Amino acid sequence: QFTDVDCSVSKECWSVCKDLFGVDRGKCMGKKCRCYQ
């Protein structure tokens, strides 16, 4: 899942992904958070 959340490192996305999608992991791609589903 792509998001509009800005990031610089993948760990910044983990709590974002948890809140948005209920998944614990994501990564930073192209300065935006992407969440695993």
From Swiss-Prot:
From the record, give the cysteines joined by S-S bonds.
Answer: 7-28, 13-33, 17-35
Sections of the chain in a coiled coil: none
Quick one: where is this thing mainly located?
A: secreted
Q: Name one GO cellular component term.
A: extracellular region
Q: Which Pfam family is one of those matched by this entry?
A: Toxin_2
Which tissues does it occur in? Expressed by the venom gland.
The residues the entry assigns to the signal sequence are none
Q: Where in the cell is it found?
A: Secreted
Named from the GO MF annotations, one term is: potassium channel regulator activity
- Which residues are recorded with the post-translational modification Pyrrolidone carboxylic acid? 1
Check the record and name the PROSITE patterns matching this protein: SCORP_SHORT_TOXIN (PS01138)
Comment text on domains: Has the structural arrangement of an alpha-helix connected to antiparallel beta-sheets by disulfide bonds (CS-alpha/beta).
Give the similarity note: Belongs to the short scorpion toxin superfamily. Potassium channel inhibitor family. Alpha-KTx 01 subfamily.
UniProt-recorded name of the protein: Potassium channel toxin alpha-KTx 1.3
Species of origin: Hottentotta tamulus (Eastern Indian scorpion)
Phylogenetic placement of the source organism: Eukaryota, Metazoa, Ecdysozoa, Arthropoda, Chelicerata
